[in-house]
Each structure stands twice: as C-alpha cells, then as structure tokens.
Amino acid sequence: LECEICTAPGLECNSWTKTCDANQDTCVTFQTEVIKAPVSFTFISKSCGTSDTCALNYVQTSPHNKLTHKSQRTCCTGEECKTLPPPVLEHKVNQPDGLQCPGCFGLSTKDCTEHLVSCRGPENQCLSITGKEFGFIFRALSYKGCATESLCSLFEKRFWNVLEDVEVDFKCTPALPKSSQ
C-alpha cells in the first residue's frame, strides 16, 4: 500500500508518496483544529494507518479551559484516495458538559502542574499520558485533560506505533461531575 504523507496549515498539503509498513493497511487523512479562544488554527495531515482505527473518526481533548484540540479523519485505499474529499470538522464551540478532569501539559518533562478543566461537548473521559523518547522532537511529554472515548480507544489500539521508538503510558478514567470533586 502506498499513501500520501504530509502535514500543513489549512485544508491542503503538498505530499510525497510512501510505501506503508506491512501492518498498515489504509491511508489516513486528519483535519485538525486547535482552538485557543478566540483564535483557532487548522491543519491537515496525511499518513499510513491501520483500518481498525478508522471507525474512531472524531476525537477531541481539552488540557485547559481555554484550549481544545479536535480532529476528524477519513480512511481510504488506492484510487478512492484521489477522489475522497478531505474530512470536514464542524466549526462549533462545544459547551461545557458539567464534567471535569485534572488538566496539564508539559514538554520535556514527565510532570506538569495540574488544574481542573471543564470538559466540553462529547468529552466524558479523563486522559493522562506520559511519554518519552519522541525522537528528535522532544524527550518527554506529560499531558492530562478531558477526552472523548474515541481518543481513549485510539490509545488502546496503540496508534502511536507508527512513530519510531516512542514509549507512551496512558490511562483513561470516567470524568466526574463538577460537584463531586
């Protein structure tokens, strides 16, 4: 299987073609929006992937009350990829859903200072990630925040194994109502 590979701001990217690894059986296109109210940043990404994650086409997470990351994706193979329109994200602001989680984000560290985050829209899980050895990008990562069940399922399927030598520990627990914390 060959797939286009690229990442760029906006809705289109200039890609090159890559032969996927043996365990990768689909091409994936992500449309991602990072919202730091009132500003939002959109980018597109194309890569090889595994078809067992295709049903998890919408994921969302918030590590901070003013920061939300959401991503819509489509999967395709062969000629279908040439005609399939890119995934479309709804540009709506999800309102708080009455749940909350600890939230924080730290690069180059496995610890970060937590604060409570109000979950939004479909986010009903608390996600905690620690990772190390992200190649040349950074040595460590610590992340906590609200997340959709679909994002937790993606982590359960170890979707990051397309990255070389990445060690990631993650845990998802149900988000709690605001009054109970």
Curated annotation (Swiss-Prot):
Major localization listed first in the record, in broad terms: secreted
UniProt protein name = Phospholipase A2 inhibitor gamma subunit B
Query: What keyword terms does UniProt attach to this protein?
Result: Disulfide bond, Phospholipase A2 inhibitor, Secreted
Q: In which tissues is it expressed?
A: Expressed by the liver.
Identify the InterPro entries for this entry: CNF-like_PLA2_Inhibitor (IPR050918), LY6_UPA_recep-like (IPR016054), PLipase_A2_inh_N (IPR004126), Snake_toxin-like_sf (IPR045860)
Disulfide linkage? C3-C27, C6-C13, C20-C48, C54-C75, C76-C81, C101-C126, C119-C146, C152-C172
Quaternary structure annotation from Swiss-Prot or TrEMBL? Heterotrimer of 2 subunits A and 1 subunit B.
UniProt lists the family membership as follows: Belongs to the CNF-like-inhibitor family.
Cellular component GO terms held in the UniProt record: extracellular region
What is the organism field in this record?
Answer: Laticauda semifasciata
Summarizing the function annotation, the protein's role is:
Strongly inhibits its own venom PLA2 and all other PLA2s tested including Elapid, Crotalid and Viperid venom PLA2s, as well as honeybee PLA2s.
Q: Where in the cell is it found?
A: Secreted
Q: Cite a single GO MF annotation.
A: phospholipase A2 inhibitor activity
